[in-house]
């Protein structure tokens, strides 16, 4: 189900570390809204609202509506700075987007049919994720909240690569634009631990026989 995210923002005049600390003590998060040929706009956001939004996976790969001065601007989350020890958001970077300009965003991967996968159900294999997200390029209207990766047909020893992912309309994977060497595995079905150990032991025994 699609979720709409709205951020109520206020313009921020004071900048610098001291001003940012004062904002955080007041329950605010300093942020910057930039891009699309416009001047960067320092803003503040409500810390509790930001924390709640960050709990949603879709918030990281979604077109956000930033309400500022009675107007709404579309943006994507570009960066989050967190306190290393405390549950505090230090700063957000928000990138403006327009309907006719392509954007690049990291989108989470959702793996389906893992339990019914051939290699798991009949071969006793284990699913191994090499990636949990992928960078895509698309127009804002085509941006998916996540991409499904179906592993049902994978057998033991099989891997599914980037080029084998079924993509929504208008969406491409950035890595594949750099050539076939970047068509990396996304998920693999590993051999059962016992079988892998037996193969290794068998290989060592064969080497020992040849040496003698």
Swiss-Prot record:
InterPro entries, per database record: Rbsml_bL25/Gln-tRNA_synth_N, Ribosomal_bL25/Gln-tRNA_synth, Ribosomal_bL25_b-dom, Ribosomal_bL25_C, Ribosomal_bL25_long, Ribosomal_bL25_short, Ribosomal_L25_dom, Ribosomal_uL5_bac-type
Gene3D superfamilies per record: Ribosomal protein L25, beta domain, Ribosomal Protein L25, Chain P
CDD domains linked to this entry: Ribosomal_L25_TL5_CTC
Organism superkingdom: Bacteria
GO molecular function: 5S rRNA binding; structural constituent of ribosome
Region described as Disordered: 1-22
Keyword line: Ribonucleoprotein, Ribosomal protein, RNA-binding, rRNA-binding
GO CC terms: cytosolic large ribosomal subunit
GO biological process: translation
Pfam families for this protein: Ribosomal_L25p, Ribosomal_TL5_C
Stated role: This is one of the proteins that binds to the 5S RNA in the ribosome where it forms part of the central protuberance.
NCBIfam families on file: bL25_bact_ctc (TIGR00731), PRK05618.1-2 (NF004128), PRK05618.1-5 (NF004130), PRK05943.1 (NF004612)
Record-stated family: Belongs to the bacterial ribosomal protein bL25 family. CTC subfamily.
Record text on subunit structure and interactions: Part of the 50S ribosomal subunit; part of the 5S rRNA/L5/L18/L25 subcomplex. Contacts the 5S rRNA. Binds to the 5S rRNA independently of L5 and L18.
Listed PANTHER family: RIBOSOMAL PROTEIN L25/GLN-TRNA SYNTHETASE, ANTI-CODON-BINDING DOMAIN-CONTAINING PROTEIN, RIBOSOMAL PROTEIN L25_GLN-TRNA SYNTHETASE, ANTI-CODON-BINDING DOMAIN-CONTAINING PROTEIN
Name used for this protein in its record: Large ribosomal subunit protein bL25
Species of the source: Thioalkalivibrio sulfidiphilus (strain HL-EbGR7)
């Amino acid at each position: 189900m699609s979720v709409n995210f709205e951020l109520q923002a206020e313009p921020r005049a004071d900048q610098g570390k001291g001003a940012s600390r004062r904002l955080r003590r007041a329950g605010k998060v300093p942020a910057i809204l930039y891009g699309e040929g416009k001047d960067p706009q320092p803003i503040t956001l409500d810390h509790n609202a930001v924390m709640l939004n960050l709990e949603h996976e879709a918030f990281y790969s979604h077109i956000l509506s930033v309400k500022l001065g009675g107007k709404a601007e579309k943006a994507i989350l570009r960066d989050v700075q967190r306190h290393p020890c405390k549950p505090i958001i230090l700063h957000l970077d928000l990138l403006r987007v327009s309907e006719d300009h392509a954007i690049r965003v990291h989108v989470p991967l959702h793996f389906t049919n893992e339990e019914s996968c051939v290699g798991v159900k009949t071969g006793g294999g284990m699913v191994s994720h090499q990636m949990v997200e992928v960078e895509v390029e698309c127009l804002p209207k085509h941006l998916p909240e996540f991409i499904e990766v179906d592993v049902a047909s994978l057998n033991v020893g099989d891997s599914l690569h980037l080029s084998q992912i079924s993509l929504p309309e208008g969406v491409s994977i950035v890595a594949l634009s750099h050539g076939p060497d970047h068509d990396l595995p996304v998920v693999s079905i590993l051999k059962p631990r016992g079988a892998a150990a037996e193969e290794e032991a068998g290989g060592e025994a064969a080497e020992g026989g040849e040496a003698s």
